[in-house]
Structure formats: structure tokens, C-alpha cells
């Protein structure tokens, strides 16, 4: 079974770079305090690193 991580949006996407808003949508996050469970891959980790100031990650 693949390792999964929980990602929660903790800061608003209002007044953020369009690229960062698109990254949040790519992660499946729609609004604040929304949590998604994702498979831990290098691509997902890269997306999380890009918006690390807006999300919380639980291993």
C-alpha cells in the first residue's frame, strides 16, 4: 500500500499568486480547513513545498 499524507489548507488563497492558487486546486484544496489525503509522491511533495506557507502536512 502506498504511503499517504494529509494536507490541510490553513491560510486563505485570497490575494495570492495565480500560480499558487492553481497549485492548491491541483492538490484538491478548495477552501480553508479543507483536508485531503494524497499519495506521497515527489510531484505532490513539490506542490506542497510551493505552497508550504498556506498548508499543514500530517504524515
Curated annotation (Swiss-Prot):
Ribosomal protein in keyword set: yes
SUPFAM superfamilies: Ribosomal protein L30p/L7e
Pfam families: Ribosomal_L30
Gene3D superfamilies according to UniProt: Ribosomal protein L30, ferredoxin-like fold domain
Family (UniProt): Belongs to the universal ribosomal protein uL30 family.
Gene assigned in the entry: rpmD
Classification via InterPro entries: Ribo_uL30_ferredoxin-like_sf (IPR036919), Ribosomal_uL30_bac-type (IPR005996), Ribosomal_uL30_CS (IPR018038), Ribosomal_uL30_ferredoxin-like (IPR016082)
UniProt GO BP: translation
Top-rank taxon, per record: Bacteria
Protein's UniProt name: Large ribosomal subunit protein uL30
Gene Ontology molecular function: any one: structural constituent of ribosome
Record carries keyword Ribonucleoprotein: yes
GO CC term, one of those recorded: cytosolic large ribosomal subunit
Organism: Actinobacillus succinogenes (strain ATCC 55618 / DSM 22257 / CCUG 43843 / 130Z)
Keywords: Ribonucleoprotein, Ribosomal protein
Subunit: Part of the 50S ribosomal subunit.
PROSITE patterns assigned to the protein according to its UniProt record, in alphabetical order: RIBOSOMAL_L30
Amino acid at each position: 500500500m502506498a504511503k499517504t499524507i494529509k494536507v490541510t489548507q490553513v491560510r486563505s488563497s485570497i490575494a495570492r499568486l495565480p500560480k499558487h492558487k492553481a497549485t492548491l486546486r491541483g492538490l484538491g484544496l478548495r477552501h480553508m480547513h479543507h483536508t485531503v489525503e494524497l499519495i506521497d509522491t515527489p510531484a505532490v511533495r513539490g506542490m506542497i513545498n510551493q505552497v508550504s506557507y498556506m498548508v499543514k502536512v500530517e504524515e
